């Protein structure tokens, strides 16, 4: 219920943002066009956001014959978690990471990068996938996928506004002055902040909850703790290969650890809790 409320709020916020932009640049006609566009976008976000994210990372669905260990782990964990088996995907990237997506447990998918499969042991992968299945069980995946889609749209608007301002803008309501360009510049500044706030709406507390639930599913909290330490180090020292699929800022919150590097300012808006704290909590768990 809580996640459905967040989903509704996010979709309503996107509609409001687009209508305001439409009103600024096109008056009543612009508002109507923006509203219709928002309706289509909201529908697509709800039903297809998971497919958009998987396509964004060029994730390939794999069969038990293609990835036997991965399927063996998932098969064992879904029985313990009491949820349907999700589709299993692999992302061709040396970046060691994983994520889950899908609008509900019956339409879910888990994805692991080639980097994480090379880095972690069998039991550590159990810990990671148990965490991702906990997100599925807790129905975090819909709100995460929608947030990724909406953040991507907002970021696209920011880039559009930036280039429009550089090349003279569209005048907006104030065709005789600089109102249009000022509005575009304001949008270029505000939109990335809005995208970040969308991601922060996906509370960091859900990661702690998924860690705890994942540990209960696997019965191996130490395995997830070991995996998180390796992943934190692996992502901070990751060097992309030419063929690698790169992490997108709009969907960074979906991964088990933050795949993006950032300085002190970005840490204020981090989408994940500090890894050391997650590890400390996991190591304190007893079963």
Curated annotation (Swiss-Prot):
Transmembrane segments: 7-26, 30-49, 150-170, 181-201
Binding site for Zn(2+): 131, 135, 207
Any one GO biological process: proteolysis
Membrane topology designation: Multi-pass membrane protein
Any matching Pfam family: Peptidase_M48
Keyword Nucleotide-binding in annotation: no
Active site: 132
Record HAMAP family: Pept_M48_protease_HtpX (MF_00188)
Name of the protein: Protease HtpX homolog 1
